[in-house]
Every structure is written in structure tokens, then in C-alpha cells.
Amino acid sequence: MEKPRKKPYGPAFWCAFGRAAAQFAAVAALAALLLPGGRAALPEDPAALARTALLAGVVRPVLEEAFYRGLVQRLLERLAGPRWALAGQAVVFGLAHGTVPQKLYGFAMGLVLGDCAEKTGRVWPGAALHSINNWIVLAGCLAGRGV
């Protein structure tokens, strides 16, 4: 039996989105304090940097949320239930990231974004948070190289 979709803009939706935003901020703050961060190599050419920013800040978050939360989480939910789906997609999302600290951060963010998708019934709120995260990381990388 398919679970009914939640109302997209009702109070429950905005409460779930606000909760996810708070969790996102907490995970990001803890990661900044506890995980040693590597800086990504960014292109020097302004046009290439603009393409990288567009891909990292818009395209990848939308595609990743559609895949991990829209496809993987929903498939796992049908197979094993919502708790296993949340954990499973977070593991897969975390493993898809580079270094061990990135994998740990990816896992934690996968839990937050997956919970957001579960509570709101939509992937776009998570895509918005994911995009904000990637823009913050990109800004940190640029600041780290003195731009």
C-alpha cells in the first residue's frame, strides 16, 4: 500500500523543513569542529570556476537528491520500511563521497536530508539544503586559497 503524499505547503511541511534546516546547521557546525577538512582543487580560469560553481551548487544537489532520496530511499522504503530506508540511503550517500571525513559528513547529511524527504514527502527541500551546503563548501574552498 502506497503511503499518501504529504501536503506540500502546510504547517507540517514547513515544520519538517525547519527541523531539517536546524539539523543541517548542527551537523555542519559539528563537522567544522571535529573533522579535518581537505580543500578541493578548484580551477583558476574564471569560466571553469563558474561551471564548477553551477555544477556543485545547482546541478549536483538536484541530481543527487533525486537519486538518493527520490529513488534509493523510496525503493528501500518499499523493501524494508522507512527506518532502514533512511539508514540505507545515508550509507550509500556517504560512501559516494571521497575521503573518510567526507564520507562521515555525507552519512550524517544523508540522514538529515533523508529525514527531510520523509517528513515533507518531497525531495526539493533537501535539494535546497544540499545546494546551500555545497555553496558554503565552495566558498570555504575559495576563501582557503585567498580568493
Residue ranges of model-derived segments:
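Hydrophobic alpha-helical transmembrane segments
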Residues: 14-21, 50-54, 83-88, 103-107, ...
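Short, amphipathic, aromatic/basic-enriched membrane-interface segments that mark the entry/exit
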Residues: 58-59, 70-80, 94-101
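Functionally important transmembrane alpha-helices
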Residues: 90, 102-147
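Active-site His/Glu-centered metal-binding helix of metallohydrolases
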Residues: 62-67, 71-72, 99, 128, ...
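Small-polar-interrupted transmembrane alpha-helices in polytopic inner-membrane proteins
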Residues: 82-97, 131
